[in-house]
Structures are given as C-alpha cells and as structure tokens.
Amino acid sequence: MKESSRLRGLYAITDSKLLADGRLLPYVEAALKGGARLLQYRDKTSDEARRLREADALQELCARHGAQLIINDDAELAARLGVGLHLGQEDGSLAAARALLGRQAIIGATCHAQLPLAEQAARDGASYVAFGRFFQSHTKPGAPAANHELLREARARIGLPIVAIGGITLDTAPSLIAEGVQMIAVIHALFAADSAAEVERRAQAFSQLFNTP
C-alpha cells in the first residue's frame, strides 16, 4: 500500500480518561467502523502490562478494519507489535526510532506550531508531521496556536503528509482539509460521547469530509 493512501483520513487518538471503565475497545471499534484510518494509542501511565494487553487488542481491531495502529511515545512497544510510532519533541530520538523500527514503519512527529521542527523531523526520517493546536484543546490547552499560513508554508517546503490536531471539530475540520491537510487528529470531538453508536456516527461524519470534492 502506498504511503499516501495509508496516511490520509480521520486519525483517532485514544484518551485513557475518556475511554476508561471498559469503553476503550468498543469505542475504538466504533471509530474504526466509522472510517478512522489511523489510531494512536496514547496512554501515559506506567502500567506496562496493561498497555501491552490493550495495544495488542487494538492491533487486532485495526487489522480487522484495515487501519494503522500508532503507539504514542513507546518505541519498544511499537517494535514488539510491529506497528507505527508517534513521538513528541521530548519523547526521544526520531532517528533512533527509525533505526529500531525499520524503513517501512510509520513514524510521526509532533511539531507544535514550528516549521523548523517539521523540517528537522523530515530529515530524521519522519513519515508524517503533526501541527497544532489549531483551536482550543482539551488535551493540551496551553499549547501554542498554529494557523493556516503554517500549513501553506509546510506544504511548500516539506514533502510529507501533514496532520492537524488540537480542538478540531466537524465544523472546523473542512477549512484545514481545504489547506491540504491529509489527516485530522481528533480526541474529544470523537470519543467524548455517550455511546459507541455516537462515536461511529461522528467518525463517519469526519471521514466523509475527505470524500467531499
């Protein structure tokens, strides 16, 4: 599968608080049924055994639905499962992760609102770069704001797929996609829902934005 086709569409990111009390697997499966093409497992706790169990179960769900699993900030877990990795600016060396995971692995990099960080990530072997926050974010409310001009500059200077993240909703996503963003990363606007059925409905709505002419 070409990288361009693997790295496009709704990028769902888990949240250990939103998806507590048994919601993780049913809500994630609902997002995948709704069309999410990538799933990032983001869990900052120290319970390695539980994270391995959950990541293994998520890998099975992603395989069943033809989606890509990305592990947040745990290169060893990503290597163990043979899946992708996402690194923040303080999560270790991207070049070292590339050496560990191999040439074919998907490795993404958080670049905040800074084009130089994205250019460095591209040199270090990133598969995609993530910019944000674009709007007020529940997950990282104090993060510096990114804007549409940054996206235009990044498209002109970096030959990698771009992820937009940070407070994105169904109302605000279209303007980002219109700027050429290949992936929209969503947490609360997807998973802060009362039921798995609602998650699936939201995922379908986000996914349809990428099919609009």
Curated annotation (Swiss-Prot):
Record EC number: 2.5.1.3
Necessary cofactors: Mg(2+)
Coiled coil: none
Residue numbers binding 4-amino-2-methyl-5-(diphosphooxymethyl)pyrimidine: 40-44, 72, 110, 140
Biological process terms in GO annotation: thiamine biosynthetic process; thiamine diphosphate biosynthetic process
InterPro entries linked: Aldolase_TIM, ThiamineP_synth_sf, ThiamineP_synth_TenI, TMP_synthase
Pfam families in UniProt: TMP-TENI
Binding site for Mg(2+): 73, 91
Pathway stated in the Swiss-Prot or TrEMBL entry: Cofactor biosynthesis; thiamine diphosphate biosynthesis; thiamine phosphate from 4-amino-2-methyl-5-diphosphomethylpyrimidine and 4-methyl-5-(2-phosphoethyl)-thiazole: step 1/1
Binding site for 2-[(2R,5Z)-2-carboxy-4-methylthiazol-5(2H)-ylidene]ethyl phosphate: 137-139, 167
Functional note: Condenses 4-methyl-5-(beta-hydroxyethyl)thiazole monophosphate (THZ-P) and 2-methyl-4-amino-5-hydroxymethyl pyrimidine pyrophosphate (HMP-PP) to form thiamine monophosphate (TMP).
Protein name, UniProt field: Thiamine-phosphate synthase
Annotated organism of origin: Stutzerimonas stutzeri (strain A1501)
Taxon lineage: Bacteria, Pseudomonadati, Pseudomonadota, Gammaproteobacteria, Pseudomonadales
